[in-house]
């Protein structure tokens, strides 16, 4: 419903909560997902999350878009961050106030994945078979 109304900030929070739920009770209680938990997430659920983001953002957002952009920059995360608006002039975008929560955001801007713990979580999501098949090429 939040995606339908283009309430992207709340949709992003719900996406994060759902990823924790998919990872299991321990992740829910801890409040974040370890990259090693992604491989056990049901592909159908990740695929659904990706499809919903793509549909309700007019094709602009979603994990498969992020994977496509990452591939286009030679799989270099340091080049991905500025392209999707998570980093500008070498400075990380502050959450949530400095993120763009509208269709004016760069392609791949959402959903957000916590980068405080490095790139492993995002990399695991983008390499999950259900996401990889959506952009027709494994990373």
Roles of regions detected by a PLM:
Residues 1-139:
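Surface-exposed peri-terminal alpha-helical interaction modules
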């Amino acid at each position: 419903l939040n995606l339908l109304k283009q309430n992207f900030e709340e949709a992003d929070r719900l996406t994060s909560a759902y990823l924790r739920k998919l990872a299991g009770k321990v992740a829910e209680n801890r409040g974040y997902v370890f990259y090693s938990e992604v491989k056990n997430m049901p592909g159908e659920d990740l695929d659904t999350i990706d499809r919903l983001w793509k549909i309700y953002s007019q094709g602009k957002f979603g994990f498969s878009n992020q994977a496509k952009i990452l591939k286009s920059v030679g799989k270099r995360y340091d080049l991905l961050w500025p392209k999707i608006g998570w980093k500008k002039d070498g400075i990380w975008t502050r959450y949530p106030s400095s993120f763009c929560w509208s269709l004016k955001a760069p392609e791949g801007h959402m959903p957000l994945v916590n980068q405080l713990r490095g790139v492993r979580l995002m990399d695991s999501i983008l390499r999950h078979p259900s996401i990889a098949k959506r952009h027709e090429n494994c990373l």
